[in-house]
């Protein structure tokens, strides 16, 4: 009987980044590290770095990850824009915003353009689930985990998902930090992480 063995590094004392942000803890160098990771992943898994036969073989290797790609397709590009069974939001506080989003035809058209790119543009290997729950950190280090959503997709997917998740954390901070001054300070730190992540990503990808 064919068997397999997985060897994993024990990441200790690393903590999931989402937990760190919810507790208002800053991570030194986070923007630089994640910008480098996203840029190098995007470049090295693409035709810009790989020989054509290797890229085609790698694309075929990940083409079978249909079930997990379908989860992303539904949760990101489909379900938020109608009353899907799994949707939840704080009611009645967010009812108006949800109704406005679902009635925005122009937005839904743009989302469909992005969905088409997600399903049809195999430009590079993407982590596929790059958010604060897939990053483990210490006060000065970051490691990316959970690669099971990996697939070949558009260049902008990973970096877009990461920045979008940072923005969600930004808007959620008042629920986690009650002191207005401390909350504002942490939100400004999140914005600085976004800025550094993007600038490092662009510089590394283009160098």
PLM segments and residue spans:
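Active-site activation/catalytic loop segments of kinase-like enzymes and analogous catalytic loops
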Residues: 156-206
């Amino acid at each position: 009987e064919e068997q397999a063995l997985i060897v994993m590094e024990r990441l200790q004392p690393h903590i999931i980044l989402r937990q760190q942000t919810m507790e208002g803890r800053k991570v030194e160098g986070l923007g630089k590290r994640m910008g480098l990771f996203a840029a190098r992943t995007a470049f090295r898994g693409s035709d810009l770095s790989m020989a054509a036969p290797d890229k085609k073989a790698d694309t075929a290797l990940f083409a079978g990850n249909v079930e997990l790609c379908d989860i992303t397709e539904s949760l990101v590009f489909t379900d938020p824009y109608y009353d899907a069974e799994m949707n939840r939001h704080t009611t009645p506080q967010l009812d108006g915003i949800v109704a406005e989003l679902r009635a925005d035809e122009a937005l839904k058209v743009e989302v469909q353009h992005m969905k088409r790119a997600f399903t049809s543009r195999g430009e590079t290997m993407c982590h596929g689930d790059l958010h604060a729950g897939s990053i483990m950190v210490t006060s000065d280090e970051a490691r990316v985990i959970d690669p099971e959503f990996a697939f070949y997709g558009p260049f902008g997917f990973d970096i877009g998902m990461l920045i979008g998740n940072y923005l969600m954390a930004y808007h959620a901070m008042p629920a986690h930090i009650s002191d207005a001054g401390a909350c504002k300070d942490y939100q400004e730190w999140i914005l600085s992480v976004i800025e550094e992540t993007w600038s490092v990503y662009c510089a590394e990808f283009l160098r």
